[in-house]
Amino acid sequence: MSRNLTPEPVVTGIVETRIGQLRWREYGGSREAAGDKTLLFVHGLLTNSDVWGEVVQDLSQDFWCITLDIPLGSHTIPAREDASLTVAELAQAVNEAAEQLCPHGFTLIGSDTGGVVSQLAAVQEPAGLKRLVLLSCDTEKNFLPLPLRYLQYVAYIPGTMQALRAALHLGWVRRLPIAFGWLVKRELDAAEWNSIIAPLKDAGVRRDLAKVLKGIST
């Protein structure tokens, strides 16, 4: 998570995909930028585009940067109620968004769970994909990572996502290795935590998170 929330985007919008609407933001550059100058960012579990704050602030001076919010628990637009939120479906949705948002090609950048989504998106060989950049991320045989793997199973218990939301309001819980303790290098400020936790107030967002987690364990 960056020290500051993302800078003001040049343009924001919503793109339609097979799983529903995805919110996107763009920074710097131009939609007419060549594929090697277009960067598409995919975040991880229980984060959203705000995780890329300082990254897009720096890179948007030389690149056209697009951040995409996918339904991993801190998104603000719930997926379609009938959407299958397997990682493969998320990857398809990313490629559908890229086709519409990156007409001249793109470099796909994924971190954490977004890295797995990006790997599967690349395997589908979208026409516009120029490069794949994987930051610290999950892999097929380490997904979810062991400290967080319990989430794949407790997601089957009714009310767990609501309980997770309540627990994440407690600082000592957030600092546990089975929460964010090993994922952040410093204590996030109130605005950053709010960006992560507040979307879970929406029952649709909680439903989506549970679907994704159940999909991992199948």
Task: Describe each PLM feature range.
Residues 2, 8-9, 22-24, 30, ...:
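Flexible "cap/lid" subdomain of the alpha/beta-hydrolase fold that forms the substrate-access gate
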Residues 11-17:
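Short acidic-hydrophobic surface loop/beta-edge motif
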Residues 13, 22, 40:
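A broad, low-specificity signal marking well-ordered, structured residues that form hydrophobic/aromatic
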Residues 36, 53, 187-190:
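Non-catalytic, surface-exposed connector residues within folded enzymatic/regulatory domains
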Residues 44-56:
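The serine-hydrolase catalytic nucleophile loop
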Residues 55-58, 97:
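Alpha-helical interaction/dimerization surfaces of two-component signaling modules
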Residues 60-65:
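A generic structural motif
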